[in-house]
Amino acid sequence: SLPMKKDSINFSNIFSPNFMLRYAPGHMRNLSKNDQNFNYSDLYALNKTTEIETGLSAVLGFDYTINEKVNNKIVKEKFSASLGQVFNHERNKDIPSKSSLDQKMSDVVGNFKYNFSQIGTIDYKFSLDHNLNDLNYNEISTNLNFGKVEFNLDYLEENNHIGTEHYASSGISLNFNDYNKLSFSTKKNFKTDSTELYNLSYQYSIDCLTAGLVYRREFYQDSDLEPNNTLMFTISFVPFASVDTAFNQ
């Protein structure tokens, strides 16, 4: 029977193959130039773009999850993997080409997620060309919490019809106590092989008041231009309003 399930003392594994057949008559307006991505979260939607796509199509995919159990009860999702593809009866030039849904076979889209128990998660999203040779979209994001230290990392690479973005950003925060927090973040642009910015901030929070000091150094692609330095003082009254004062150099 489906979905297929396998249980052990500590884990429950579930594999769910998915199939959907749809047909929408009529004619849709031309969206071919729209900036429209396609990922796994859109796979089974009736309208994968801003409108319902006309024509006959089929969706084939699967979901696989590993759930952690305690006392024979599922307490959290440890790992998940999802994969799928759209098959169209014929090409539709009115659908955004960036989405690959205008082709007879769309990109193979997927998502993987792993839960590191108490410290955080890592997510991987991708879009593989239907020829299975070209990786058109590649995104990795992770958030880890080690108590007083928090770390995050994001990596994005776009190729071919999806785009040209290629960068990595990371940040680290040090929580001295419940009131004081120091954070640092940076972003690297691999297209230009340059660092785009640095952010250094200090934040003090107590009750409904949050005050902070932020230093930002932003670099330009033109090497003849000096980096832009900004020092900003922020104060927020939760949940009312915030005041920002910036000093540029």
Model-based region annotation:
Residues 1-249:
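Outer-membrane beta-barrel translocator/pore domains, especially the C-terminal barrels
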